[in-house]
Amino acid sequence: MGYPGKNHKQYATPKRRFEKTRLEDEKRLIIDYGLRNKRELWKAQSVLRKYRAGARELVALRSGGLSTEDYLKKRDQLVNHLYRYGLVGENADVGDVLALKVEQQLDRRLQTLVLRRGFARSPKQARQFITHGHIAIKGRRVTIPGYRVERAEEAEISYYGPSPLTNEVHPERSRIARAGVR
């Protein structure tokens, strides 16, 4: 166990530290998604690893003699959870969970959605807007760029009420509009 008040790592580091192809892929993802460091990427990979492990466990339980009713219940719990976060479609199966990619997980981060919805010009600017408190979900300020946005919350992303960016004539808003992002 351990001391419950002490935080523990939420990710696992790669086993081969200097594998060239992995390093190149990580660098590309960090640049594309505007991640601060590799730790953020490793966290996303660890979350996906847990989902895949749950799906593999379901497959093993199914072949091990679990009743159809229990299997369907557990499968629906897993798929509904992933559907709520927008990682799989509504009619997904265990195979879809096993086929998840880290890019799908990174696409659900608040930082990425702020950029894609046109609130910022670049991933770095999206991160800055979030950490400085200019972005809100359902009217509540969110200052965590790695916040996983649920499917229902996606339409509720906006500028935070007291933020100067809510004003349409703000210079940065006009730059964003001129850039053709929004």
From Swiss-Prot:
What Pfam families does the database record attribute to this sequence? S4 (PF01479)
> Quick check: keyword Ribonucleoprotein in the entry?
yes
RNA-binding as UniProt keyword: yes
What positions does the domain S4 RNA-binding occupy?
108-172
Recorded hits in SMART domains, A to Z, give:
Ribosomal_S4, S4
UniProt record, GO biological process: ribosomal small subunit biogenesis; translation
MF terms from GO for this chain are:
rRNA binding; structural constituent of ribosome
Q: Which InterPro entries match?
A: Ribosomal_uS4, Ribosomal_uS4_arc, Ribosomal_uS4_CS, Ribosomal_uS4_euk/arc, Ribosomal_uS4_N, S4_RNA-bd, S4_RNA-bd_sf
Q: Which keywords are on file for this protein?
A: Ribonucleoprotein, Ribosomal protein, RNA-binding, rRNA-binding
Q: How does it assemble?
A: Part of the 30S ribosomal subunit. Contacts protein S5. The interaction surface between S4 and S5 is involved in control of translational fidelity.
Write out the similarity annotation: Belongs to the universal ribosomal protein uS4 family.
Q: What is this protein called?
A: Small ribosomal subunit protein uS4
Q: In the record, what lineage is assigned to the organism producing the protein?
A: Archaea, Methanobacteriati, Methanobacteriota, Stenosarchaea group, Methanomicrobia
Gene that encodes the chain? rps4
